[in-house]
Amino acid sequence: MDLASLRAQQIELASSVICEDRLDKDPPDLIAGADVGFEQGGEVTRAAMVLLKYPSLELVEYKVARIATTMPYIPGFLSFREYPALLAAWEMLSQKPDLVFVDGHGISHPRRLGVASHFGLLVDVPTIGVAKKRLCGKFEPLSSKPGALAPLMDKGEQLAWVWRSKARCNPLFIATGHRVSVDSALAWVQRCMKGYRLPEPTRWADAVASERPAFVRYTANQP
């Protein structure tokens, strides 16, 4: 594995990320959520993609792609492992969204190219990274109250907002993926909350990918 080459690719791709609002449709009609996981001891990569109407946040479509994993887990290079399955799920959708929430980092990455940014560049769609853990940067401690907020900073640059979406839950790291500003990324995540830790797009993507009870109930109620 030529990590020097991959690192150079990351730096080059990151230079093309657009960190300002360039949505083709604002507000969007459809918002997607994307989540990637691994099965069979990592041999299979699974990507779930859901489509939600906006502003109702009603689930209207879901697809799950499973492909052979082509790259081992290497910290800092996860997007190269995940994006092939995301592209496969993207191609399965009957209609394309105006905005995509990706479970993972956007520019809040040491080389400013998390999976949300990488995927957004590949398909040229506005994306937001919604991550559950910090990958780089520093932030001031948050209060325990829901709504607590702090910028994630690295070398004088704001990479994300750190936001406690729910009491007694760890905060989310909300970042530009591509074609969305960091402030708009936070605003869109906040608009898509329904009382859970995660915004509805990535909450549903996770539920579909892992066949959680919410998804089982949803499928049971479908005609």
Curated annotation (Swiss-Prot):
An MF annotation (GO) of this entry: magnesium ion binding
Protein name listed in UniProt: Endonuclease V
InterPro entries, A to Z: Endonuclease-V
UniProt keyword list: Cytoplasm, DNA damage, DNA repair, Endonuclease, Hydrolase, Magnesium, Metal-binding, Nuclease
Positions that bind Mg(2+): 35, 103
Top-rank taxon: Bacteria
Sites annotated Interaction with target DNA: 73
UniProt EC number: 3.1.21.7
Keyword Hydrolase tagged: yes
Gene it is expressed from: nfi
Reactions catalysed, as given in the entry: Endonucleolytic cleavage at apurinic or apyrimidinic sites to products with a 5'-phosphate
Compartment(s): Cytoplasm
Any one GO biological process: DNA repair
Enzyme class: hydrolase
